[in-house]
């Protein structure tokens, strides 16, 4: 365990601590080597406060290991925003250049997007913290997987096409019907009578502008070509979105957030006489890492058919702006807007 501490101390002193490896491999042994071992030398789960300490300490290395207890007693006066260490930034800058060179060689369509709210992708990934975040393993930088971007863009099309059918009043059931039809690869049967509604939503109008004067069946054909089905791969590649290197040199790329569930005993208990949700339950703070507002990302899509790829990119812009990507989007997280 002492070797682990020495390793992280060395990384901090050299300003090259890999945030991804630290976050996933060493918590919370950096704070208290004894945290993961109980008196019987068995693995023990860290408490909420210990998780909080481990998250906060990302920006401070190990805060002079022998002074941690004193720091804790002073209510953790630790910066809750995390910048990329200088040496790690230099390595990431080189990776970013290689990545953009690759995109250019493929003639991908790229755009700069900035987070309009906090962003967290991979919140439910397996982690000793109970919460997680998706980081580039070798660089400790948050990113948005291309699969996540493709998924939210595809769902945007389901929501819009759900406006085109009039089977029932439940909008989300209609959207699910559209989704099932697309996944099976035969949406035309379900959408054979689909038509643009007279009262089209703002999102619907922007969606239709992307496809011009095309009729609904032609739009469906192009969507199948973009996203594919269970039997056929799509013709457009959705690349991972990564932070723009030159714009994050002195900008925090991670910050601490908190969720505060109150009624765990009511929902988790199998007993019948448990008191209903109310003020008599205690909040249980759960700390987790997010990407702050105003962090720039490079978003890219590619494909052989340039016109089809441009339409896919336009759909991505709508999806990131209106639906958001990652976890907690219903609370406003994960919104990104293109900028110049």
Swiss-Prot record:
Q: Which Pfam families match?
A: RAMPs (PF03787)
Q: How does it assemble?
A: Part of the type III-B Cmr ribonucleoprotein (RNP) complex, an elongated RNP with Cmr2 and Cmr3 as the base, with Cmr4 and Cmr5 forming a helical core along the mature crRNA (39 or 45 nt in length), while the complex is capped by Cmr6 and Cmr1. The 5' end of the crRNA is bound to Cmr2 and Cmr3, while Cmr6 and a Cmr1 subunit (Cmr1-1 or Cmr1-2) cap the 3' end of the crRNA.
Q: Which family does it belong to?
A: Belongs to the CRISPR system Cmr6 family.
Cited function: CRISPR (clustered regularly interspaced short palindromic repeat), is an adaptive immune system that provides protection against mobile genetic elements (viruses, transposable elements and conjugative plasmids). CRISPR clusters contain sequences complementary to antecedent mobile elements and target invading nucleic acids. CRISPR clusters are transcribed and processed into CRISPR RNA (crRNA), formerly called psiRNA (prokaryotic silencing) in this organism.
> Which gene name does the record give?
cmr6
What CDD domains does this protein map onto?
Cmr6_III-B
Q: Write the protein's name.
A: CRISPR system Cmr subunit Cmr6
Entry annotated with the keyword Cytoplasm: yes
Species annotation: Pyrococcus furiosus (strain ATCC 43587 / DSM 3638 / JCM 8422 / Vc1)
Q: Which GO terms describe its molecular function?
A: RNA binding
Q: Which InterPro entries match?
A: CRISPR-assoc_prot_TM1791, RAMP_III_fam
